[in-house]
């Protein structure tokens, strides 16, 4: 089949019996965008989007879309499917419409279970496995309780349910079911809106901003993050510290989006606003959902430098931060991957390998599901540093990357 990429996408979409709006929805794009891709009116999507299209169309070989004649297993680039994903997905998609007859769970008890689940998430190297065992029951119980209660109790239950979806967002991210990312982010925000709780709405918005950002919907991400931050502003003088932490985290997200689109001045302006908030909150403060803190703001500075391709700025920020000051193992692992990206941009293979090895030892299930880490490992496997071929193979094996 000698066809351009756009026509190949249309061929496999038609073969799957999938309409253009349905596929576009799974990708977080508009039907008009997909039509432009299929007809060749806009340039071919980049690799991350091609992978998402291949996954949505249930293709095992990326060459079905690229047409280069060489097998390119989607699983190598797209990452693994966690063993518990089906169970979490089942809990999310059990649409129960019959009346709840069982006694609802205690809302304070649900809130405590959620608090403990967050603690597990931040303190475990295998955080996805731990969440995979906790989330199905927590999702079902929180959903049933929110349906069974009335009045103010239902509002309180919906706040907890929004928080459960915010936690689930970390589990479903970077797995081969992108529709679940949109589902949990939308539900987190919707439940918070139904509860009329500004703080929960900001938390749901923070989750949705991640999805919008990764879909390249920059303006929507910035608008939502700005609106959510502004929603909190009238309360900050008297609200708990977490409200200020959430506002700071939203500023940090705006900075990240600007960096992703290459806007240096805007990125650093919002980073500085978030940094001022972190400084006011003190050295011991850390926001549970977003990990917002002084140490993580320094980690954000590394990421801004990397995204803006200013490795000198990124390296200075990295040198100013002891990774051990980041309490969350998952977030610490991500930071080490970002430092590895500095070395990769500089063509430093041994440095890249050393940082990725550290990241794997800190949080094995962060690196296994991180696309940047996967790409760097694939490059290292193709061109290992001198004398490090076996070390690369060992790390690839520990990460679980299926490279022939």
What is each model feature region?
Residues 1-16:
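A short, Lys/Arg-rich alpha-helix, primarily the initiator
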Residues 9, 20-24, 34-38, 65:
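Conserved hydrophobic/aromatic packing and binding residues within compact polymer-binding modules
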Residues 13, 24, 54:
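The alpha-helix within a helix-turn-helix
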Residues 28, 48-64:
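DNA major-groove recognition helix of helix-turn-helix/homeodomain DNA-binding modules
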Residues 28-44, 70:
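Recognition helix of helix-turn-helix/homeodomain-like DNA-binding domains
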Residues 58-74, 297:
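Short C-terminal boundary/hinge segments that cap the last helix of small helical domains
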Residues 67-93:
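Short, charged recognition helix plus adjacent turn
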Residues 114-404:
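Conserved binding/catalytic microenvironments
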